[in-house]
Amino acid sequence: MLGVNLFTLSSWLFQEGEATVGFDPVTMWHAMAWPARTVVIVLFIMSCWSIGVMIDRWIAYNAARKQSRLFAPAVAGALKDGKIDEAISIAEQNKRSHLAKVVTAGLQEFQAHQVSAEISGETIEASKRALERAAAIVHAELKRGVSSLATTGSTAPFVGLFGTVLGIINAFRGIAGAKSTGLAAVAGGISEALVTTAAGLFVAIPAVWAYNYFTGKIESFDVEMDNSSSELIDYFIKRSSRGKK
């Protein structure tokens, strides 16, 4: 039944070829009914939100990457010389680095529990828990807003499809209310259907691309934080072994 209706509608489009319809954005906007305009406005808001999240996450991840590249060798050198205070100071100077945030938590916890030259297993365990908590917090910070990209990518096509349905309905209403069945009778409804479908895809595709890209970045950051935590715990264990000798 739907195939027959669409075939009939396409046949009507080629009748009365003298009708002139503009397909520029302004003309199509004026041809839309308010329900379809509302759909386009919603998609525009979703697009703006997605772009804002993309820019925010791109800036945050780039800053984290750049500062971490400077932080890692500097803090490694300080710890090699046994200068924990200096290592903490270096970490605090690189506050946008995901590695610095995790390492700072571990070093501060280690320093707070070290009341003597001897390093106990409890101190190492407390430092490990601090590292795990910090890594979880940083992971949540890195992921902030990214899930909304997935939501936009999955729902925008359906929002556009809703506008398409409204456009088709408007097209048939135009046919029913017009004396002729030519292009002019259905142009407004068809333009609504085309615009909202295209807008939904236009919003969804970049959001899905960005979500996959940022998810890969977060996974990479998680691996780096896990490796840094393990290396720091190994450092504490080695330092504990040297203290017992």
Where in this protein do the model-derived segments appear?
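Terminal intrinsically disordered, low-complexity tails
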Residues: 1-5, 242-245
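Hydrophobic membrane-targeting segments
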Residues: 2-73
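Helix-termination/interfacial motifs at the ends of transmembrane alpha-helices
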Residues: 12-33, 142-217
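Hydrophobic side chains within alpha-helical segments
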Residues: 40, 53, 59-60, 148, ...
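Amphipathic, non-membrane alpha-helical segments in soluble helical-bundle scaffolds
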Residues: 41-45, 96, 162
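Alpha-helical transmembrane segments of polytopic integral membrane proteins
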Residues: 48-55, 61, 81, 165-168, ...
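Predominantly long cytosolic amphipathic alpha-helical stalk/bundle segments
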Residues: 65-159, 170-182, 209-245
